[in-house]
Amino acid sequence: QDIRAMVPVNLRPLDQPPWELGNRFGLAPLLMPIGIDNPVERVYEVRRRMGELKDNYQPLLAYGVLALAGLLIKPGQDALMGLFQAKTTAIVTNVRGPDTPLRLCGAGVSDVVFWVTTAGDIGLGVSIMSYAGAVQFGLRTDEALCAEPQAVIDQFVAEFDKLTLL
């Protein structure tokens, strides 16, 4: 049993700083293995599937399609975006933040969180961000799809508790 999540895949070289500001990512559908009960097996299966996605053409192709969509009039944009949305249950994104705490105007920044953007009929967004040795999760839901988002959040906690027992 799987659900399809659209995940952004970084297209910039990791060993080189970006020459200009802005996003450079492609989107790829990741089948999330929700039917695997063992949390360790599930993590490794997600990692394996992500590795396959990063090693194929799909994220680069999606980047090109999104760039093309930006040049089209609204009906054309809607049609292209519909291709992505029709096969997607969720958007899941992971951002690696700094390993050490930042300072802003002399004050320490204790927590950082962001919210993934969802579009159209995609009713679930999960954002994951590491910062200074901690991980923050954000959950965004469409009430028609998930009227009780706290129940999903509680499951995050339960799954992490399972991992810490191993």
Predicted feature locations:
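A structural signal for short secondary-structure junctions
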Residues: 1, 22, 83-86, 118-122, ...
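Extended, hydrophobic beta-loop-alpha segments that form or line the acyl/peptidyl-thioester binding
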Residues: 120-166
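Generic recognition of flexible, low-complexity loop/linker segments
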Residues: 77-80, 113-114, 124-127
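Hydrophobic "lid/gating" helix adjacent to the active-site nucleophile
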Residues: 1-16
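Short beta-strand/turn micro-motifs at beta-sheet edges
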Residues: 15-19, 124-127
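Short, glycine-/Ser/Thr-/acidic-enriched flexible segments
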Residues: 10-14, 35, 97-99, 129-133, ...
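Helical lid/core segments from catalytic subdomains that handle acyl or acyl-like groups
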Residues: 17-98
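A short, small/polar-residue-rich loop/turn motif at beta-strand boundaries
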Residues: 88-121
